[in-house]
Amino acid sequence: MQTVRSYFFGPTPQEQNRKWQSIIRKEQRQLDRQVYHLKAGRKKAEVQLKQLAKQSDITNMRILAKEIARANRHGKRLAESKALLGSLSLQLNDQMAMLKIQGTMQSSTKIMQDVSSLIRLPQLSETMRNLSMELTKAGVLEEMRDEMFLPVEDDEELMDLADEDEEVQEILTKYNVIPAPSEKAADAATHREQSLKQALPSLSNGIAKDSTEIDEEQLLDIRDKLDALKS
């Protein structure tokens, strides 16, 4: 009976909300899987990092530490995306509660903010575009302007070299790979920047060819897996 009614009159607000919640839960599970695989790849990279330390292979240690730093930043973005999805889910349920009281759903600024943030994320863009159109038809969301669909800028491109060097240094220090740099060195920041430019060549040219325990193929495999998780 419910299906027949939906065919002639369209889905009820409650049916619409169940569909929206299902979409949100699906995306949250996708993010959970990405986080799981990202952690597994990062753990493997950390093991390889310690093995490189035993070989005193500073160049490749820095390359791998840079990949771990990127994985950490990507993991943070995934966590923030899941939190936004959770916020959107709560806001939509609040709309259903308001519907019972006032008999209608109203456009929400908070929902607009959450959808705007989520739609700019590459991994959620297509799903959130489709969801935003449904929310607009239901009157929960005002029509979004074109600039709201622009993708978020990649922090990998915006990151300053010195900041990236600092992250790499923190990772190496965390795993007791090399000692933290001396704060008394007046030219420490400049030296680190110059060192990193030399220590982080492309993987195709920068992997040590004479490594006995970890060869070029292993390091390329690690980086490929980390890059795949970020796509």
UniProtKB/Swiss-Prot annotation:
Annotated compartments: Endosome membrane; Endomembrane system
Biased composition, class Basic and acidic residues, residue ranges: 184-195
Predominant location: membrane
Residues covered by region (Disordered): 184-214
Record membrane topology: Peripheral membrane protein
Summary of the function given for this chain in its UniProt record: Class E VPS protein implicated in concentration and sorting of cargo proteins of the multivesicular body (MVB) for incorporation into intralumenal vesicles. The lumenal sequestrated membrane proteins will be targeted into the vacuole after fusion of the endosome with the vacuole.
Protein name as catalogued: Vacuolar protein sorting-associated protein 24
Originating organism: Schizosaccharomyces pombe (strain 972 / ATCC 24843) (Fission yeast)
